Amino acid sequence: MTSAVWAVVSEQEAGGPDKDQPLRDDIRLLGRILGDTVREQEGDAIYELVETIRQTSIRFHRDADEAARQELNALLESMTPEVAVQIIRAFSYFSHLANIAEDQHHSRRNRAHAVAGSAPRPGTLANALARAEKAGIGAAELRAFFDAALVSPVLTAHPTEVRRKSTMNREMEIADLLDLKERLQATPQEAREQDEKLRRAVLTLWQTALLRKFKLTVLDEVQNGLSYYDYTFLAEVPRLLCALEDHLAEQEGGEPGAELPPFLRIGSWIGGDRDGNPFVTADVLRETVRQHRDRVMAFYLEQVGLLVTELSLAKRLVAVSEDLTALAERSGDRAPEHREEPYRLALVGIHNRLKATVAAQKAADDGKTMGAAEDGHLPYPDAAAFRADLDILYRSLMANGSAILARGRLRHVRRAVDSFGFHLASLDLRQNSDVHERTVADLLEQAAPGTNYHALDEEARIAVLRAELTNPRPLASPFLSYTEETRSELAILRTAAEAHARLGKTVIPNAIISKAEGISDMLELALLLKEVGLVSATGESAINVIPLFETIGDLQACGPVMDRLLALPEYRALVDSRGGEQEVMLGYSDSNKDGGFVSSGWELYKAEIALIEVFARHKVKLRLFHGRGGSVGRGGGPSYDAILAQPAGAVSGQIRITEQGEIISSKYSNPENGRRNLEILVSATLESTLLEAEQASPRPEFLAAMEELSKTAFTAYRSLVYETPGFEDYFWSSTVISEIATLNIGSRPASRNKTRAIEALRAIPWVFSWSQCRLMLPGWYGFGTAIAAFVEARPVDGIAFLQSMYREWPFFRTLLSNMDMVLSKSSLAVASRYAELVPDEELRTRIFSRISAEYQSAITSLLAIMGQKKLLEANPLLDRSIRNRFPYLDPLNHIQVELLKLHRSDAGSDHVLHGIQLTINGISAGLRNSG
């Protein structure tokens, strides 16, 4: 197996460019080590069975070989569940190790481009800044852009990250060892040691459980999210800010200019997202804020401690400022060896004040107050005071011939304080509008029995809410009895207010209303925030109230809703108090489940245009928050292309975007990858704002064509998913949706209530299930029908017209490019095996044949418009990556089908369910963006 398993890589790469040879070498190396590990740990029989299954799977997939199908069935049916588990683990780890090798190769190629002095690549800051310079945009205009900019990736805990943190840690160790091997010119002895370290790491990975034994809690998810600050954000966000400042200084003549504001903000929903998650409580929110705070304080203590060891400057050798001398004298450090070292003295004092701050914070957690520490050091009142002390050191170094020292760790810590404060992450609150409605109704009814808020129409509700918003009297009273839900909601919001009082407004700057439909949804949340002091009756708000428009209908209505909302004086006052900015969140997931990929993309685009026009009319600055998932079916795909495909005026220097599930780890678990992905977001935001003139508005006939395509695709999608008799049964039988609920991959339930209705199912498990069976249906269904109808109505020039749309319009080009990737990961041959799980043969044949026909139509249409002979012809690197995965991805699908048969026949055991869960993990790893 060691060489044969990876032979397919060599075959597919034959004659390929030399630049990819290191990737092939890494894959072979990891494959050989894993093969040796399997043989040593599990024996020759398992070792040989893996290879037999792989070869048979290739014949079935590549040649549609019916004999191979029967042979594969016989092989899989003869396996015991215990053997199946070992086979699954082997193929799953191939996926994980291939991902590591591929990520390492991306970093390798980026370094090679930099070393060679190649032209900067799209998506890099260097490219964006070069394009800006070529367009005549100088340092002053760039500074103005960054002064008003906000770029914010927001981490969410949606349950599509199926890897354990322990597994991720082992994989990071392997990645680091590969990186070291690449950079180190090793002696033979060092090479042997490196090989042994890799073997140890792979063996540890093999002996580490892939799956969690217990379901994640919200605080487990918080801890997972915090890992990415350690891996990437705490180091790379300040580094990126410093790089931009250096570029501007170079443009301005070489002297350091004013520091840029911390426009790159990492946000999080983890611990604050209550929509459908009953486990997010006031206590959980409080603990989340505490863990964030503790993590960043530990970072500052570590960094200041390192500065103590580094800045050993003696005052007899270098002059220091008066402020630095005074700060050193206040340190309290009387060690004789430090008497001549003012920077060290000052830093010891800063370190002691930080320790006093931590002690005071922990005392406040317990409801106590604390003044000076036992050693007399006062805690810092806020992060700004800590920054002010660091500034004294910085100015002294800069003024006394030590600028290069000032620009090292000290500079980065100062920028970290700007970005992360004492709170680390800006945490969003989110709740469903229905919950807000019930809470407000309860408060009103208890305060004035007979109000009967539930029975009021929208206009009457608006009138009540407007009156209450300007009434200084609180509604809630400790002497009245409320529902458990009302008490819980008020407790959460009071906890947010407490966090503001302790750590400042940036700790929880946003409150999001999911399923926002009308004016009252916004006013209800504002009223609840007023109850806890985050909104005042005089029209001031300490927090952004943000609607999330999710369904096709809500996207179509969002322009008129916001138009009327911004015209209300009571609400406009809140917006003005927040700097005249209003954020709107757009939901990619639910709109896709509601209307399909084509219609979702188009309605989102139109919603943005409508919002841009409304906000311009009201002279309010619009910030869009894009609720994108990892998969294309939930708005995923390359962030750079997606941002540049926005309509003119949609970005304007500010964007927030969710980073979900397995996408977080693939982007940010490695600092080099993390830096590159942060650059992509900043670069795309800069280019779409400052170079907007280069992006011509789409021709009116393109817009009309897209409207027509969307309507046809919408009808086709709705017809299948919501109007076809038996479709729900087909879905629940032919996918792993039932089994996903048993996998401990998130704290949130998979469905909003206990029903099999597609409407009640969350968008994430909906897409995840279609990915597992390799149909990826949410990422393409309806497109083929729409194109066929469009061309049929224009037999002469229909395709030519669509080709011009593809060439000239970034939105349409990105839409098709994402679909190209999704279709290439799909496999009708594999999906046909899942269809066998549907017990009703008539239902199975009727629906699968319909899906198959649409799939073929989608591919035919896509290739015609893109001018390709095969999928991903324009992206050979991605094509090769995906094809290289099939030999070890397809067997996991085949084994999953066999185990599902056993599990559902009541003949299954715990081993069977465990095997199914392992296949879910392995398939997700192979697809990389499955949920």
Curated annotation (Swiss-Prot):
Give, as one word, the top-level EC class.
lyase
> What positions constitute the catalytic site?
158, 593
Its recorded reaction(s) are: oxaloacetate + phosphate = phosphoenolpyruvate + hydrogencarbonate
Q: Give the E.C. number(s).
A: 4.1.1.31
PROSITE patterns given in the database record: PEPCASE_1, PEPCASE_2
The Gene Ontology biological process terms listed for this entry are: carbon fixation; oxaloacetate metabolic process; tricarboxylic acid cycle
Indicate whether Nuclease appears among the record's keywords.
Answer: no
Keywords, ordered alphabetically = Carbon dioxide fixation, Lyase, Magnesium
Instruction: Identify one Pfam family in the record.
Output: PEPcase
Please tell me one Gene Ontology term that the record gives under cellular component. Answer: cytosol
Which one of the record's GO molecular function terms can you name?
magnesium ion binding
Which cofactors, by name?
Answer: Mg(2+)
Q: Record keywords: Thylakoid included?
A: no
Instruction: Please give the InterPro entries that the UniProt record associates with this protein.
Output: PEP_COase, PEP_COase_bac/pln-type, PEP_COase_Lys_AS, PEPCASE_His_AS, Pyrv/PenolPyrv_kinase-like_dom
Role? Forms oxaloacetate, a four-carbon dicarboxylic acid source for the tricarboxylic acid cycle.
Q: Which family does it belong to?
A: Belongs to the PEPCase type 1 family.
Which HAMAP family does the UniProt record give? PEPcase_type1
Protein's recorded name? Phosphoenolpyruvate carboxylase
| Annotated source species | Azorhizobium caulinodans (strain ATCC 43989 / DSM 5975 / JCM 20966 / LMG 6465 / NBRC 14845 / NCIMB 13405 / ORS 571)
